[in-house]
From Swiss-Prot:
Its main location: nucleus. Pfam families: HVSL. It catalyses: a 3'-end uridylyl-uridine-RNA = a 3'-end 2',3'-cyclophospho-uridine-RNA + uridine; a 3'-end uridylyl-adenosine-RNA = a 3'-end 2',3'-cyclophospho-uridine-RNA + adenosine. Its EC number is 4.6.1.-. The gene is usb1. One of its GO terms (molecular function) is lyase activity. This is U6 snRNA phosphodiesterase 1. Belongs to the 2H phosphoesterase superfamily. USB1 family. 3'-5' RNA exonuclease that trims the 3' end of oligo(U) and oligo(A) tracts of the pre-U6 small nuclear RNA (snRNA) molecule, leading to the formation of a mature U6 snRNA 3' end-terminated with a 2',3'-cyclic phosphate. Participates in the U6 snRNA 3' end processing that prevents U6 snRNA degradation. In addition also removes uridines from the 3' end of U6atac snRNA and possibly the vault RNA VTRNA1-1. UMP binds at Q149, Y187, S191, F192, H193, V194, S195.
């Protein structure tokens, strides 16, 4: 809906002017209109969120651009969070203060930029390619350290050891959708993992070596760790700005 302003020359010259006196304040826009613009500009709030806790955007924000990525969610048992607390504690003892992730997943794409009007067509493309895929088992039990491409953040993650072939199949289909929109595809040799915690800066050297061995021992000794680090991939999600779309697997 376009909002059009008219100059005084375009107004009806036959109308009589209002009598002098105090004017009433203008009425507020209808709630439906406000909601419409709130939905269209939801990426403004996202832009502020990406600056939170010192995180740095990997691409310049522009109005109408929506940060978008595809992933498989991992919803852990409560005991898994106890294991994560121990891992964060060991990292702190080695001089690295980590922030636990608020949600857990296995990435199936890089973060790309979608224009608002591309979102629904992109999601439909994903659904068309992924809706016939079956659920599969994932096991992620080996601790590993990662950094983002810009070396501005460091992550502690669990590398996937079972389910690789299925994940590669998903990525192949997601890449096809990305290519349709001339967007960057996933890494050629991906290391599928569940990110557990993160910190600002490049802390790779501090976490590797003896610290990494100590972290792995925590996992190996933790009660029922073999069941806590496995899950069934039951759906694929696409998050675009503040919108999340779910594609269930068979």
């Amino acid at each position: 809906m376009a909002l059009v302003s008219y100059s005084s020359s375009e107004e009806d010259e036959g109308e009589t002017s209002e009598p002098p006196g105090r004017r009433l304040p203008p009425l507020p826009p209808p709630t439906t209109v406000l909601r419409m613009f709130q939905d269209m500009e939801g990426d403004e709030d996202l832009d502020e969120n990406t600056k939170h806790e010192g995180r740095i955007r990997s691409f310049k924000h522009e109005r109408g651009n929506w940060a978008t990525y595809v992933y498989i969610p991992f919803q852990p048992q409560e005991e898994f969070l106890d294991l994560l607390d121990e891992l964060v504690s060991v990292a702190a003892e080695n001089g690295v203060l980590l922030t636990k992730m608020s949600e857990f997943h296995i990435s199936q794409s890089q973060t790309v930029v979608l224009r608002h009007h591309w979102i629904n067509p992109f999601v439909e493309s994903l659904k068309d390619k992924l809706h016939c895929m079956y659920r599969f088992l994932c096991i992620a039990e080996r601790i590993k350290v990662y950094t983002n491409q810009e070396k501005t953040r460091t992550f502690l993650g669990l590398e996937v050891s079972v389910g690789m072939e299925h994940l590669l199949e998903v990525v192949s289909e997601v890449d096809r959708s990305l290519q349709e929109f001339n967007l960057q595809t996933f890494y050629q040799e991906p290391s599928f993992h569940v990110s557990l915690a993160w910190c600002v800066g490049d802390k790779y050297e501090k976490l590797k070596g003896s610290c990494l061995l100590e972290l792995q021992k925590v996992i190996d000794r933790f009660e029922d760790s073999d069941t806590l680090t496995r899950f069934n991939a039951e759906e694929i999600r696409c998050k675009a700005g503040n919108k999340t779309f779910c594609i269930p697997l068979l």
